[in-house]
Regions:
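N-terminal hydrophobic/helix-forming segments and targeting peptides
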Residues: 1-235
Length: 235
C-alpha cells in the first residue's frame, strides 16, 4: 500500500482535499501540508541548519553578548569526524547537538513504547551522558516559554554528533535536542514548523540566560549541595 500523508488530522479533513481516483505525481520541491507541516527531502538535517542560522540571526538582532558557534558537520552518520574536529577547535563551554528524531504519530508505526508527535514540541534526550545541569537549564527555559518537551530516553548512544562531542577535550557538557520527523531518510520527510519555531525560541532564551559564572560541572554543584546540607544540620 502507498501511504498518503497530507498533514490532516481526521478522515473528514482528508476527504475535503482528495478522493478515490485522484491522480498523483511526485513533487520535487518542498510542499506545505495541512496543519503547518512541511514536506521536503533532506530535512535531516537541513532543517537543523535553518534553525541554527535563525538562532544566530536573532541573537545578533537582540544584541546578546555571548560567544555562540554554529557548525554544520560532516560524517555524523559514519565517523563523527566533523563534530570531533569542530569541538577540539572551539572547545566550547557547553554544546547542543541539533538533529531529528523519528515521529511515531503515523498509522503504520504501532510498535513503539513511547510517542513522538509532530507539532507537540522538541524532543529532549534523557541519557547518562547528557549533562544534567544543561538539561535543567533547557527544561527551565521551556517551562518559562510554555514549550512542551517530548522526552526520549537513550541508552549508551544517541547516534548523533553528541556521542562524539561530549568525549572531546576534558569532556564537553552536552545535550541533544531533536526535531520530530516523519519518514526519515526518504525524499518526503515531514516536520512541523511549529516545532521548528519553538526550538528556535528555546535556544535563543537558553543563550540569553547563560552566564559566564555558570558551572556545568555536577561535582561543583554537589559541593554546594553538601555545604547547604551541613549548614542545615548545624542550624
Amino acid at each position: 500500500d502507498l501511504n498518503l500523508d497530507l498533514g490532516t488530522l481526521s478522515k473528514e479533513e482528508t476527504l475535503k482535499l482528495v478522493s478515490i481516483g485522484d491522480v498523483l505525481i511526485h513533487e520535487y520541491t518542498y510542499q506545505m501540508l495541512e496543519n503547518n507541516l512541511l514536506s521536503a527531502r533532506s530535512l535531516d538535517d537541513k532543517i537543523g541548519v535553518y534553525i541554527c542560522t535563525e538562532v544566530l540571526r536573532r541573537v545578533k538582532e537582540m544584541k546578546i553578548d555571548k560567544g555562540v558557534y554554529f557548525v554544520a558537520t560532516v560524517g555524523e552518520e559514519t565517523t563523527g569526524r566533523g563534530a570531533k574536529f569542530a569541538t577540539t577547535y572551539v572547545t566550547p563551554t557547553c554544546a547542543i547537538a541539533l538533529d531529528v528524531g523519528s515521529g511515531t504519530d503515523v498509522n503504520y508505526r504501532d510498535n513503539f513504547t513511547h510517542e513522538v508527535k509532530l507539532g507537540n514540541g522538541p524532543i529532549l534526550t534523557i541519557a547518562s551522558h547528557a549533562n544534567q545541569i544543561l538539561t535543567r537549564k533547557i527544561i527551565n527555559s521551556a517551562k518559562k516559554l510554555n514549550i512542551n518537551l517530548q522526552p526520549a530516553v537513550e541508552i549508551a548512544r544517541t547516534y548523533t554528533d553528541m556521542d562524539n562531542i561530549y568525549l572531546e577535550e576534558k569532556g564537553i557538557p552536552s545535550q541533544l535536542i531533536s526535531i520530530p520527523l516523519r519518514y526519515m531518510h526518504s525524499s518526503v520527510e515531514v516536520c512541523s514548523l511549529k516545532d521548528v519555531e519553538e526550538i528556535i525560541e528555546l535556544l535563543v532564551d537558553l543563550i540569553k540566560n547563560m552566564d559566564e559564572n555558570d558551572t556545568f560541572n555536577p561535582f561543583e554543584e554537589y559541593k554546594w549541595l553538601k555545604k547547604e546540607y551541613i549548614n542545615t544540620l548545624k542550624a
